[in-house]
A protein has these predicted regions:
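PLD/PLD-like phosphodiesterase catalytic module centered on the HKD motif
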Residues: 1-46, 51-177
Length: 177
């Protein structure tokens, strides 16, 4: 999801005012905000997640939304920056199977530079201007909105810069036998 893609989507969607923030104070709020953002996305999302635990993008409802996005047609793209993709593979995270089946749509990269590997925050960005930001990815305390492009912009810039400095996560690629 490049800056151009986001702006193209915004012009197609009729960019409106920012929506009120969603509460993110505990695990329940976090799961609800994540699902609402995934449901509101049309074709593209970007996820920065240091580590994937079972309760992060692993629920049946979240996977259904991720599958819907991945199969939404032309322009569908799920970009994920993950610090340790091997850990998610070893733990059989449910997102791995989706990424392997749809490897041209679900793009996974891993940071190479120390500055990126030290980044402890996580976020989800949608093509509708939505975002979920956790300053500490290990804690369920952050902020979110279904549409707030002004708040999303610095996160999108950070994601795009990190994406360029990252390498393709080959551990998740399906084996061609």
């Amino acid at each position: 999801m490049s800056d151009r893609d986001v702006h193209d989507e915004a012009s197609n969607a009729g960019e409106g005012p920012a929506t009120p923030p969603l509460p993110v104070r505990d695990r329940s709020d976090l799961a609800d905000a994540r699902l609402r953002l995934l449901s509101a996305a049309r074709r593209r999302i970007a996820i920065y997640q240091p580590a994937l635990s079972d309760d992060v993008y692993g629920s049946v409802a979240e996977l259904a939304e991720l599958r819907r996005l991945a199969t939404s047609g032309r322009g569908a793209e799920i970009r994920l920056i993950l610090h340790a993709p091997e850990d998610a593979l070893r733990d059989n995270h449910r997102l791995v199977a989706l990424a392997q089946r749809l490897s041209s749509i679900v793009l996974v990269r891993t940071p190479l530079e120390e500055v990126d590997l030290a980044y402890a925050s996580s976020y989800l960005l949608t093509d509708q201007g939505g975002y979920l930001f956790l300053p500490d990815a290990r804690r369920a305390d952050g902020r979110a909105a279904l549409a707030d492009r002004a708040a999303q912009a610095p996160l999108l810039q950070h994601f795009n810069e990190g994406w360029e400095r990252s390498a393709r996560a080959t551990a998740w690629l399906p084996l061609a036998l």
